[in-house]
Amino acid sequence: VALVVLAFGVLGLLWMHQQALLQQRQQLMRSVAIGIADDLAERMRLNAPQRAMYAKTWGHVSPSAPDCTHTACTRQELAAWDQQQLQLTLQSQLPEGDTAVFAVSDAPNWLGIVIAWRDANETYRTDTASGSPNCPTQMSCWRLFLRPDR
């Protein structure tokens, strides 16, 4: 009897440890998503006149752009380069991650950024308020609103 109780206790500890590891991973993914969204928001603020060029839907792959780190670029080229950098960042930091950038439906001149990452449990979900796209299935999402011209 004592051995059965001990076995259940060990199984309970293992389950709690596994849950803690899953939560830790989700918090890490959420922190990375917040950083990516913040980086894109700053890029959009610095290039506010081209804010329409930052619009993006789920699964959209950014076209190639000139390397603006060593070459002077126009604002349009800079926006395309920012999108390309976003794609590279997602691939390296949030594998299977995706992003959407949308105009906020009930607030002129405001934009929204949604960063999604693979999560079978869908720990963090976003609603479709203000024109935000649905978070894809089996993914968690982080949403950020910004006004680029401020």
Question: What are these regions, as identified by a protein language model?
Answer:
Residues V1-A37:
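Aliphatic-rich helix starts adjacent to a transmembrane/signal segment
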Residues L22-R150:
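Flexible, low-complexity segments enriched in proline/glycine/serine and punctuated by aromatic residues
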